[in-house]
């Protein structure tokens, strides 16, 4: 079953609705973004979520100690890193990590295997931006790619293309933000429809 992460959640009610609709993880942004929240807001979201829903904090080149403090304060389960963080940074953080890799070329994806993290998130490459750009990339870059850890697919996913994406890439999970928004705000019907579509394709692909 392909996992689903709803990223950029700013409201506890949206987080709970997404979790109850079947989201496996909720992403909370601490980096510079229109979706950024304060640690206090993030803590409220984390505390509202039901059991078995992963709480993922998104950071970009944040000092390690600051990430650790925020993670402990909010009750984060996983740290997702979108900057130039090194392998040592990931190893020494003390939390399960997801490392975001921009899909520049095949070489950078293959080199990402060296990161000591729990999963790799492959996102569109847009110069000057660290994810959340709403753009897709050429999924052919992932064809035959040998990764030694789970692959999470991101980059411009929405209800119209996620079925094709899952069927073609066969990722461990998918990550969506702008694809379930209306006028920059998370939309519960879109979230439900997105998760439903992923589950349908997952079932057809695996038969379970």
UniProtKB/Swiss-Prot annotation:
Pathway: Amino-acid biosynthesis; L-tryptophan biosynthesis; L-tryptophan from chorismate: step 3/5. It comes from Desulforamulus reducens (strain ATCC BAA-1160 / DSM 100696 / MI-1) (Desulfotomaculum reducens). It is an enzyme of class 5 (isomerase). One of its GO terms (molecular function) is phosphoribosylanthranilate isomerase activity. CDD domains: PRAI. The keyword Magnesium does not apply. Keywords: Amino-acid biosynthesis, Aromatic amino acid biosynthesis, Isomerase, Tryptophan biosynthesis. The keyword Isomerase applies. GO terms for biological process: L-tryptophan biosynthetic process. Belongs to the TrpF family. Its EC number is 5.3.1.24. InterPro entries: Aldolase_TIM, PRAI_dom, RibuloseP-bd_barrel, TrpF_fam. It catalyses: N-(5-phospho-beta-D-ribosyl)anthranilate = 1-(2-carboxyphenylamino)-1-deoxy-D-ribulose 5-phosphate. This is N-(5'-phosphoribosyl)anthranilate isomerase. It holds the Pfam family PRAI.
